[in-house]
């Protein structure tokens, strides 16, 4: 779904209302794939950056992208606008990745080479940025991930702008959940530590013990392409995640009961609720 001009203008109105009242504004782009509507990304980011500059507000912007459309010209334009932190995901090396990540143009065309070439080209940039290369882990792909990490080191090992994020895949309620080769909690912990020890010369993203999910934070929300407001970018089909919508004047029409469900961890400091409020909410309402 492409965001309409009406929603774009509503977001700008919201920014006009909000930015003068804060000290830090963080804009994150997530999908779907945000670069399918690159013009809208650039329009809103540019507007937000100018507003922040005008009011002396610190501007931070992050993008999660599959990397397929992140050509060098687009990358440079985004970084110069202030989008200087990216996350790009691989499902192992080329052979393994192309089993799962196929092109929208052809079900027989893998995406690894295009994504890798785009990632490689970012090295040419003289700008300051950070790219987290997310590597998905399953119960059967550790060899493939190791192969990918060797390739990453040979290409980016001397550049401290690139980091590795090891992340196990999870069952999130999709139709193919039962087909996934999932790691147990203990297997995940052991495998990640094993890989970090083996590739200690790489930079790894450290989530830390005090991690708080963005969806648990009262001052964080997502505006979807249709103007719906959500808390979680994973549970997009969950009705409890539809907490309101943005109005034409930039104000937010919020359902307080739904909204507060996501921030319960800040009331009782329950670490499980802070780690993943979605899991807590689904568990509660399905019991």
What are these regions (language model features)?
Residues 1-13, 34-96, 104-114, 135-147:
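Canonical radical SAM enzyme core domain
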């Amino acid at each position: 779904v492409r965001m309409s001009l009406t929603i774009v203008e509503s977001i700008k109105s919201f920014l006009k209302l909000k930015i003068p009242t804060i000290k830090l504004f963080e804009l994150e782009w997530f999908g779907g794939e945000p670069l399918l509507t690159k013009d809208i990304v650039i329009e809103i980011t540019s507007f937000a950056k100018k507003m922040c500059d005008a009011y002396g507000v610190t501007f931070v912007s992050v993008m999660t992208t599959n990397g397929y459309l992140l050509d060098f010209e687009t990358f440079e334009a985004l970084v110069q606008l202030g989008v200087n932190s990216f996350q790009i995901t691989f499902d192992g090396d080329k052979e393994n990745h192309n089993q799962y990540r196929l092109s929208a143009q052809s079900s027989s065309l893998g995406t690894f080479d295009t994504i890798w070439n785009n990632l490689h080209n970012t090295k040419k940039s003289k700008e300051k940025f950070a790219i987290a290369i997310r590597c998905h882990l399953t119960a059967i792909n550790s060899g493939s991930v190791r192969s990918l990490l060797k390739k990453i080191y040979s290409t980016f090992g001397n550049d401290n702008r690139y980091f590795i994020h090891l992340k196990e895949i999870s069952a999130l309620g999709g139709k193919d959940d039962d087909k996934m080769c999932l790691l147990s909690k203990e297997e995940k912990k052991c495998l990640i530590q094993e890989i970090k020890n083996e590739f200690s010369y790489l930079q790894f993203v450290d989530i830390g013990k005090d991690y708080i999910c963005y969806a648990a934070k009262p001052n964080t929300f997502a505006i979807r392409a249709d103007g719906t407001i959500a808390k979680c970018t994973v549970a997009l089909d969950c009705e409890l995640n539809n907490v309101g919508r943005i109005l034409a004047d930039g104000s937010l029409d919020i359902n307080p009961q739904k909204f507060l469900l996501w921030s319960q961890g800040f009331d009782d400091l329950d670490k499980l609720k802070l780690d993943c409020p979605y899991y807590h909410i689904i568990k509660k309402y399905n019991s």
